[in-house]
Design a protein with these regions (language model features):
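Long, histidine/aromatic-enriched segments associated with O2/redox biology
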Residues: 1-247
């Protein structure tokens, strides 16, 4: 989402407060605004496509982009420029091969809705967009699906659309807290830690897959691309799936 130019800090605060309330209601399986509006001459407070549905594990995550802290000319849009972490000010790291397009990049506020029911996700984002009408506009959106990434050694590593296990060496909840604190959570002493402590950063990428070419590669070529066995996920030179991958 982008916040309208000229919007005040008070308007931004009011929007985030209303979004928070609506998110709490939707994650609890309730209608936005509570009971349905009985006034037939007024617009419903909830769009209704999940009426009677369970939230199915709905979570809603919010993040702030660099442009929320400072405008294109460096202006302090909402009085929070001094709170911008250096990582946002200097720009998020780029991946080799990135071909970022302006229409799919950046934004003032990002909203991620996750659920075991895609209609619940769509309902959540739709209602937040409805609430923000006049204060925010949708900059870009992306629907997705897939098993959740494995966050515990008790879970099977999920597969990506190339057919390979993806995330074998990700941090797990059983890892020492020091590992999570170093690689995942912002700490009190970190840049921005005075307000971002316990939070994290999000980088999102849309991957262009030439599936029709990939699907016709020999198995050996596919496995050498990832350095892992396609069936079991182990590195080609090791029997253990959790061993470091072959480079």
């Amino acid at each position: 989402f982008d916040v309208a130019q000229g919007a005040s800090a008070a308007e931004l605060k009011a929007l985030l407060t209303e979004w928070t309330t609506a998110s709490e209601q939707m994650c609890a399986g309730e209608l936005v605004g509570g009971e349905p509006n009985a006034n037939e001459q007024a617009a419903p407070r909830d769009t209704g496509e999940t009426w009677g549905y369970k939230p199915n594990g709905l979570t809603i995550t919010f993040g702030f982009g660099a442009s929320l802290f400072a405008g294109p000319n460096g202006e302090d849009r909402f009085g929070i420029k001094d709170k911008m972490p250096a990582l946002l000010a200097t720009g998020m790291p780029r991946y080799r091969g990135d071909q970022l397009r302006d229409e799919w990049t950046d934004g003032d506020i990002i909203v991620q809705a996750c659920s075991n029911d895609p209609q619940v996700c769509a309902h959540a984002v739709r209602n937040l967009a409805r609430i923000g009408l006049g204060t925010t506009t949708v900059r870009w959106s992306q629907a997705g699906y897939g098993r959740t990434s494995s966050t515990s050694i008790k879970q099977e590593t999920p597969r990506n659309l190339f057919g390979f296990k993806d995330g074998t060496n990700n941090i797990k909840e059983e890892d020492p807290a020091s590992e999570l604190n170093e690689h995942l959570w912002v700490q009190d002493g970190d840049d921005g830690g005075d307000w971002l402590s316990g939070g994290s950063y999000l980088m999102a990428r849309r991957i262009h897959m030439t599936a029709e070419i990939w699907d016709n590669l020999r198995l050996r070529e596919q496995q050498e691309t990832f350095g892992r066995d396609k069936r079991y996920g182990a590195p080609l030179s090791h029997p253990n799936p959790t061993s470091p991958k072959d480079e």
